């Protein structure tokens, strides 16, 4: 009689999941080494931690990374825009370090493939969720700060966010991406897009996901705490995809 295989949990499950992926590419994209223990912690989402014996997760590192990111971006904007009032550079910073801005950076370094997620998140495409990508990016910055100090962490921020920082402007922070997309399509004599929006979660904490279609083709996908913001992000993604095709 064969015995049922015992499910690996706890630190053994953590080590097994972490070692299943080669992290060399990620570290190369970051341009810095991170100790194994810190890197494991930075990549451990609470869903994985909770499903494997309440292991430590990356939320404390995320807290640190958020502070490092905010200071590094704020100081750089202060230097780049000496004549801009506080209200403008504050809006610029908010746009750059937003969930969407962080998720963009995470996708550029293919961070999603390295995040340790629980089964529930894996089944709901957690590796592509803006919220998870953004939080893990901050956790990595927190890990870099803990190991190397502020100056190294700042340099990583300025390298990763170089384009966003140098092209920031107060104008366009609250851009209506749905209108921008509509105008771009009109110029190309393309048909209008359609939006499909769904929501999950309890009434007090709903997460909306919007998908924008051009005919039968998905052009963009966005998340947000309400339908409007989710559709705006989906429209932004669609607009960027159109621009890439034209480039």
UniProtKB/Swiss-Prot annotation:
Q: Does the keyword Cytoplasm apply?
A: yes
Instruction: Give cofactor(s), names only.
Output: Mg(2+)
> What are the subcellular locations of this protein?
Cytoplasm
GO function terms (MF aspect):
double-stranded RNA binding; metal ion binding; ribonuclease III activity; rRNA binding
The biological process GO terms on file are: mRNA processing; regulation of gene expression; rRNA processing; tRNA processing
Q: Which residues form the DRBM domain?
A: 176-244
In the UniProt entry, which residues are flagged as the active site? Answer: 66, 138
Which PROSITE patterns does its entry note? DS_RBD (PS50137), RNASE_3_1 (PS00517), RNASE_3_2 (PS50142)
- Residues that bind Mg(2+), according to the entry? 62, 135, 138
**Domain of life of the native organism:** Bacteria
Q: What does this protein do?
A: Digests double-stranded RNA. Involved in the processing of primary rRNA transcript to yield the immediate precursors to the large and small rRNAs (23S and 16S). Processes some mRNAs, and tRNAs when they are encoded in the rRNA operon. Processes pre-crRNA and tracrRNA of type II CRISPR loci if present in the organism.
- Description of how the protein assembles with itself and partners: Homodimer.
Q: What is this protein called?
A: Ribonuclease 3
Q: Which gene encodes it?
A: rnc
């Amino acid at each position: 009689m064969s015995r049922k295989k015992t499910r690996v949990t706890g630190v053994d499950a953590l080590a097994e999941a972490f070692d299943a992926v080669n992290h060399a590419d990620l570290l190369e994209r970051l341009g810095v080494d991170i100790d194994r223990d810190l890197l494991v912690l930075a990549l451990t989402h609470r869903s994985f931690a909770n499903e494997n014996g309440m292991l430590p997760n990356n939320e404390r590192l995320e807290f640190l990374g958020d502070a490092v990111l905010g200071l590094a971006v704020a100081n750089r904007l202060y230097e780049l825009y000496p004549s801009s009032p506080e209200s403008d550079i504050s809006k610029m910073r908010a746009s750059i370090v937003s969930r969407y801005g962080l998720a963009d950076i995470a996708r550029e370094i293919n961070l999603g493939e390295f995040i340790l997620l629980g089964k529930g998140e894996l089944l709901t495409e957690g590796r592509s969720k803006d919220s998870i990508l953004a939080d893990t990016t901050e956790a990595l910055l927190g890990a870099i700060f803990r190991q190397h100090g502020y100056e190294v962490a700042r340099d990583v921020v300025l390298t990763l966010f170089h384009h966003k920082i140098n092209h920031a402007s107060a104008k366009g922070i609250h851009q209506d991406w749905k209108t921008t997309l509509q105008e771009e399509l009109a110029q190309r004599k393309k048909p209008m897009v359609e939006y499909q929006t769904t929501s999950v979660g309890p009434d007090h904490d709903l997460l909306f996901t919007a998908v924008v279609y051009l005919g039968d083709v998905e052009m963009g996908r966005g998340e947000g705490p309400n339908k409007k913001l989710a559709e705006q992000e989906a429209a932004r993604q669609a607009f960027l995809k159109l621009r890439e095709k034209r480039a």
